[in-house]
Amino acid sequence: EEGLDFPEYDGVDRVVNVNAKNYKNVFKKYEVLALLYHEPPXXDKASQRQFDMEEL
């Protein structure tokens, strides 16, 4: 049965902070790039902890 051939996870996370200076190098280095935008967490510790848990 034919279908889509999805790549398997190889166990290596490739998370990069993309900014105005390094985005061209990131485009050259990786075949696929997904950008996730989010607001920065508030300054209090509870908000920071919630943000960290959601990112995991």
Curated annotation (Swiss-Prot):
The keyword S-adenosyl-L-methionine does not apply. This is Calsequestrin-1. Its main location: endoplasmic reticulum. N-glycosylated. The modification Phosphoserine is found at S47. Calsequestrin is a high-capacity, moderate affinity, calcium-binding protein and thus acts as an internal calcium store in muscle. Calcium ions are bound by clusters of acidic residues at the protein surface, often at the interface between subunits. Can bind around 80 Ca(2+) ions. Regulates the release of lumenal Ca(2+) via the calcium release channel RYR1; this plays an important role in triggering muscle contraction. Negatively regulates store-operated Ca(2+) entry (SOCE) activity. Belongs to the calsequestrin family. Monomer; increases in response to a depletion of intracellular calcium. Homodimer. Homotetramer and homopolymer. Can form linear homooligomers. Ca(2+) ions promote oligomerization. Interacts (via C-terminal end and preferentially with the monomeric form) with STIM1; this interaction increases in response to a depletion of intracellular calcium, decreases both STIM1 aggregation and clustering, interaction of STIM1 with ORAI1 and store-operated Ca(2+) entry (SOCE) activity. Interacts with ASPH and TRDN. One of its GO terms (biological process) is positive regulation of release of sequestered calcium ion into cytosol. The modification Phosphotyrosine is found at Y9. It comes from the Eukaryota.
